[in-house]
């Protein structure tokens, strides 16, 4: 219920607490206008970090069963080759490749846009481009930096190096792929 969430965020902000939301876009049948409602909700409430994910219906979940039952998955996608990352692309069918690319790119700039809504016109231009690895790199670095501003966690050097290693491996592993529409 949006009113309950709205009231909760307002109460948290009024009491000086940071608000971190996790948003999922690219749901079956979702329009870009619906994704913008999610974006605008975050902007309106001044959330401190609006993390965003592309829907990945993992095997064994109700959403996976719903996607299989209603033919919402792209051709050839099944439990054996489901993308393991909700940061790169989507295995959900969209009305067109252009619409899918728009969602994929919007995802990459969602959290940045919530913090800088005055740049939405520029983000909308960027969304018209083909998804690319530079956008992935921007998203991972911006979100990684932004979350450290919201969730203040003290880490020992071993933990910090482990987190850095994981992100570097993830980012450069993706960069070795040649297909800009890669789902994996």
Enumerate the language-model features and the residues they cover.
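Membrane-proximal basic amphipathic "stem/tether" segments
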Residues: 105-184
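A structural motif corresponding to the C-terminal lobe/cap of the Radical SAM core domain
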Residues: 1-129
